Curated annotation (Swiss-Prot):
Its EC number is 3.2.1.14. Changing residue 120 to K: In strain: cv. Ci-0. Changing residue 69 to R: In strain: cv. Ci-0. Residues 1-30 form the signal peptide. This protein functions as a defense against chitin containing fungal pathogens. Belongs to the glycosyl hydrolase 18 family. Chitinase class III subfamily. Changing residue 299 to V: In strain: cv. Bs-1. It is found in: Secreted, Extracellular space. CDD domains: GH18_hevamine_XipI_class_III (cd02877). The gene is CHIB1. This is Acidic endochitinase. It comes from Arabidopsis thaliana. The lineage of its organism: Eukaryota, Viridiplantae, Streptophyta, Embryophyta, Tracheophyta.
Length: 302
């Protein structure tokens, strides 16, 4: 091999190494999850997904279920499930999925009447969710024939009993040919008082921790350490594929925990993205994101 040929090989090798070092790691890339459904002025599902800013959409909320109650979907001003006017969102769910966006049905929320009375009750609820929102069959599917990607646990009321049974039962449906994603939105104090047992089942794919309305474990007045300590506790204690930093999309969206976009992108995300379990950012909610433009401000850094 001539000296000139050797020099060319060395140059190509160094160029390859420099490109490899400068390329962002796939592990550090994240997506944005958004809650949609609780304000009729936030646009429809198709418009939400067409923004190109979101990788996950949680349709919120199924507010009533369990203990023999007739399940009730509440989509605020978007439609009236009781009058069967929400079925047109089925085509919009499919539109989102065609863009590679995962769409989940979110259970619970801060207002509602939900609980699980027993292991048998958990199975009844799981069967209802399978037949009405997932891959099963029912004549009364609230969102039409769309097959959602999974179920989100946003449990903020009631008893901690049997949410683990529901998670285990739902996960079994994945064996029917299509993956059923399980996601959860616990409060940042660890362990979550209502969802702790469910999250310990190791059945959850994504966990978007609510780092707001809980000052001891969220950002406040330039203090990032409480948030970092809580993040580390969650990511080292719970066996989930990915964890997300859950935030209010505007100061008015929560009582505390709002992080200015420049602080998030410069002081917080660079640290969180070092975690191999980092998945991205979750925002509450689409309505507040529209008002404040938060996702647009942070998207390139997520």
């Amino acid at each position: 091999m001539t000296n000139m040929t050797l020099r060319k090989h060395v140059i190509y090798f160094l160029f390859f190494i420099s490109c490899s070092l400068s390329k962002p790691s796939d592990a550090s890339r994240g997506g944005i999850a958004i809650y949609w459904g609780q304000n009729g002025n936030e646009g429809n599902l198709s418009a939400t997904c067409a923004t190109g800013r979101y990788a996950y959409v949680n349709v919120a909320f199924l507010v009533k279920f369990g203990n023999g109650q007739t399940p009730e979907l509440n989509l605020a001003g978007h439609c009236n499930p009781a009058a069967n006017t929400c079925t047109h969102f089925g085509s919009q769910v499919k539109d989102c999925q065609s863009r590679g966006i995962k769409v989940m049905l979110s259970l619970g929320g801060g207002i509602g009447n939900y609980s699980i009375g027993s292991r048998e009750d958990a199975k009844v609820i799981a069967d209802y969710l399978w037949n009405n929102f997932l891959g099963g069959k029912s004549s009364s599917r609230p969102l039409g024939d769309a097959v959602l990607d999974g179920i989100d646990f946003n449990i903020e009321l009631g008893s901690p009993q049997h949410w683990d049974d529901l998670a285990r039962t739902l996960s079994k449906f994945s064996h029917r040919g299509r993956k059923i994603y399980l996601t959860g939105a616990p409060q940042c104090p660890f362990p979550d008082r209502l969802m702790g047992s469910a999250l310990n089942t190791k059945r959850f794919d994504y966990v978007w921790i609510q780092f707001y309305n809980n000052p001891p474990c969220s950002y406040s007045s330039g203090n990032t350490q409480n948030l970092f300590d809580s993040w580390n506790k969650w990511t080292t204690s719970i066996a989930a594929q990915k964890f997300f930093l859950g935030l209010p999309a505007a100061p008015e969206a929560a009582g505390s925990g709002y992080i200015p976009p420049d602080v998030l992108t410069s002081q917080i995300l660079p640290t969180l993205k070092k975690s191999r379990k980092y998945g991205g950012v979750m925002l509450w909610s689409k309505f507040w994101d529209d008002k404040n433009g938060y996702s647009s401000s942070i998207l390139a850094s997520v």
